[in-house]
């Protein structure tokens, strides 16, 4: 496989590190029955397109039985090639984000800094209410369950042998966070990068990313749509790489009483 294929597969299979999963002949279904509304740990990926239709039926039955909304993270041209299949099975399709992938290729040129105390979080007790409020409180207005979902996710992450979660503390306050995931395809994936609203613009994210780059001992990648974050990643040595036909993700969600395709 070439590097682009490895990135795509690493992306699709990364949740194996922090979710329960069931592998099938056509792909994989991720789930977490203690965090049912967190999309990134409750979705299916169909790898073999030739089994797309039977996969839809299995996905719908599997998640419905668990009381979880059936959801599929689509890849390639699946949103287009299987548009009618998805609609006939009751799945609506929507676009998500405007993302670009980046591969770590060059040396880090971020200016050295020593403002933070960077710690690796290794137990559930490290996921404090102070940390959650600092990092995710800003999203509560649009999503009242953000902190609960994030608490459940981070507590799974710190118990995983394939994840490393780091927090940058400024004067003992959680200021920023980032995760490294070791994927089954020999790559490191940067994810869950977040800076507390009150600490933005002070170079803390740059310091944390530079720290993580030094830890990478395998090819590393990430995806982002945030211009400010992208500038940091490029200074850290990441370079854009096109791995998918469009700079966005497509998701399919089962709509129990509305068998329509939301994507036009």
Say what each PLM segment does.
Residues 1-65, 78-79, 83, 145-148, ...:
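N-terminal charged segments
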Residues 2-10, 43-49, 97-100, 107-152, ...:
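Short amphipathic alpha-helix that is part of the acyltransferase structural core
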Residues 35-41, 182-190, 200:
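A conserved beta-turn-beta hairpin within the catalytic core of GNAT-like acetyltransferases
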Residues 51-123, 247-249:
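Acyl-donor-binding surface of acyltransferase catalytic domains
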Residues 52-60, 195-197, 201-214, 235:
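Conserved acetyl-CoA-binding loop-helix of GNAT-fold acetyltransferases
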Residues 72, 190, 220-225:
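Conserved hydrophobic beta-strand within the GNAT/NAT acetyltransferase core sheet
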Residues 79-93, 206, 226-243, 248-250:
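Conserved active-site alpha-helix within GNAT-family acetyltransferase domains
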Residues 143-194:
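A conserved beta-strand-loop-helix scaffold within acyl/acetyltransferase catalytic domains
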């Amino acid at each position: 496989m070439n590097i682009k294929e490895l990135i795509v597969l690493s992306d699709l299979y990364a949740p194996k590190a922090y979710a329960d999963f069931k592998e099938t002949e056509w792909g994989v279904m991720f789930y977490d029955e203690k965090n049912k509304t967190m999309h990134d740990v409750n979705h299916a990926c169909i790898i073999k397109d030739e089994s797309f239709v039977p996969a839809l039926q299995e996905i719908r039955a599997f998640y419905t039985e668990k009381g979880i909304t059936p959801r599929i993270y689509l890849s390639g041209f699946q949103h287009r090639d299987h548009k009618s299949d998805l609609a006939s099975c009751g799945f609506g399709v929507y676009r998500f984000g405007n993302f670009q992938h980046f591969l770590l290729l060059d040396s880090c040129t971020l200016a050295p800094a020593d403002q933070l105390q960077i710690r690796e979080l290794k137990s559930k007790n490290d996921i404090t209410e102070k940390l959650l409020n600092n990092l995710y409180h800003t999203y509560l207005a649009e999503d009242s369950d953000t902190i609960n979902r994030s608490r459940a996710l981070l507590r799974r992450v710190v118990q995983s042998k394939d994840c490393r979660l780091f927090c940058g503390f400024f004067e003992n306050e959680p200021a920023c966070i980032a995760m490294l995931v070791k994927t089954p395809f020999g790559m490191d994936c940067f994810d869950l990068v977040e800076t507390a609203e009150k600490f933005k613009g002070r170079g803390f994210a740059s310091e944390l990313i530079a720290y993580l780059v030094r830890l990478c001992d395998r090819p590393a990648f990430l995806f982002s749509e945030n211009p400010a974050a992208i500038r940091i990643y490029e200074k850290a040595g990441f370079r854009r790489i096109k791995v998918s036909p469009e700079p966005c993700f497509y998701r399919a969600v089962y709509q129990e009483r509305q068998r329509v395709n939301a994507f036009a």
